[in-house]
């Protein structure tokens, strides 16, 4: 079914719907790009994931070309480029790609300072990157705290905060964040995030 969706998008881009696409708004393109990013995340097939992320990246770039002041367009580009970089496992070796991702996050936050998704991603980068590459645990933790105020259901931010607490020796607080992340993931029906929250709890030596 997911492959059929990708095929329909590709066909639509090249055939009779071209006039409609020519007038498509940046907001609509950004929305479709984010949908592709999420579909790619949920797919278990590597080739299919790659197709979704590549298509999402192209849609995001078209959205930015139409409106460089669209926060969602820049965030959708970050989302698809970032997931494409992680297809074969996370790596910090691609510094050019990493800097490109951070630029898109910074542009998103510049345009929309309360963009919870961008703040969560930037905060996670700050707490995970070494200082040499721009990491700043204190600043990242503050940013992640802001995210959970903006979005009470934020899963990623809570998992990242749990990891910060583990790093700082605040195990009980970390367990609280991880358990709340697990509950939010269950409420949202996100099997992938449930697994991440459970892994964090295991790392903290807590039951779930």
Which role does the model predict for each range below?
Residues 164-167, 171-208:
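Terminal, low-structured helical/coil segments at or just beyond the last alpha-helical repeat
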Residues 51-55, 91-104, 132-146, 169-178:
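Structural signature of tandem alpha-helical TPR/SEL1-like repeats
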